[in-house]
Amino acid sequence: MTESSRTLIIACAVMKDELLAVNHAPNIQIEFLEQALHRTPAKMPGAIQEKIHQADGYDYIVLGYGSCGNGIAGVRAEKRPLVIPKAHDCITLLFGSLQAHLKEHEKVPGTYYLTKGWIEEVKDPLGVLEEYTQRYGRKTAEWVLEQEFKNYKRIVLVTNGTF
């Protein structure tokens, strides 16, 4: 990539504040896709692929996604280089490296990570409880949430200076 190369970043909306905070280059544009694609990872590649096909006029495309439950499987760009981070999920991206993520994970393996974007998308534990309550009723929602979170020991808020 050169300084004059036009680059499109296609990223998850949960990373919006972090990416906007560091992008000051006029030749880099960012398009955000809805976080809800994480609930249906089978639909994620198609949504990303559609954005890639619409990316005329760019020299490079960068994905702002980790592998996200194989949500980027099969995504490709025929006309230009496609840069895909080597990351399991967005938390690794937000930590800056796999090593930094693993270092934090080793402190307490049962850690639930939250970011400003996840909270704003109401995907924090309370938001998930509300979503499940509407879907299943309160008693079943509490049981499902308890099952989902039973192995977590702590919650860590990853801020990166955007809060």
Language model: regions and residue ranges:
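N-terminal basic/disordered segments at the start of proteins
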Residues: 1-25
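Structural motif
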Residues: 8, 59-62, 154
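Gly/Ser/Thr-rich loops at beta-strand to alpha-helix junctions
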Residues: 10-17, 37-38, 62-73, 88-89, ...
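A short beta-strand-loop structural module common to alpha/beta enzyme folds
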Residues: 27-43
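Short, well-structured alpha-helical segments in soluble
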Residues: 46-57
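Glycine-rich loop at the start of a catalytic domain that most often binds anionic cofactors/ligands
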Residues: 73-80
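Long, charge-dense
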Residues: 80-126
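Active-site rim beta-loop-alpha module in soluble metabolic enzymes
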Residues: 109-163
